[in-house]
């Protein structure tokens, strides 16, 4: 496809941001204004040209379907400044394909992979001064967002859409970084219905998790831990991340239609195979938690968050997975290999990274 760019609004650098005052090594996982974002509108049945904007606000119709009927999808990915001086983004195409799956699920127009990739490259390049230095351990978080902007009062798909990408430098999702965390099983809330939108990355799934997440935090846990919504027997997700368990040289992760297919989890499965592990994707009953030698939550934000224990307060059980409170050897190997690929210090034999030029 023929991709065109145009600049809109005031395109000067964000001069209020003094780069020398950024403490790269102690960044939180949060929003920081950067210089530019990129946008593309879908109108009259086709995608338009890419717009580059320095404004961090959008104008939206009060009857837009994104506001009333949940026509909203997003992705999460990262770019890294590497020791060789290059900037690499991780698995752009896979994020494009997952967004396309979400679009099919909630009846939004699919964004062509080529357009998605070009916009990711453009927004990272425009904001390259905000990509944290390698030694900081931080990264540039990339947030693609697609919303229905067309007005509807009845429950119908919009006829117009806005796709945009903004970026923000971020530190670790959990304060301790690659360190063990405690989780608690929450049965009072479900993240997603069995035949609902759990396998799509839509905002409604995260809104449904807010109350459970607050309960977990108020009780002193890192995050909530979900069982399946239908029977409350099988492991679903760790808050906003996928679960994996390790035992007897096997990497085991849940199989469920209500779980978001994590690109990080898929990467870890491949790396586990590369390390000689067996990989099993299958339903995992809650009781099996007591048999795991290691376990973790995985996703773009956290990468791997090793699990120390999972408490089932309702049944007065505690599944202690890390006896010494430290990440297990397999988790450490997987984390080290994945980070090495992302930072370009290990050969990218699977073609996961894209150098931003």
Report each predicted region and the residues it spans:
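Extended, Lys/Arg-enriched charged tracts that mediate electrostatic binding to polyanionic substrates
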Residues: 132-147
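Helix-start/capping segments and mature chain N-termini
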Residues: 2-123, 145, 152-357
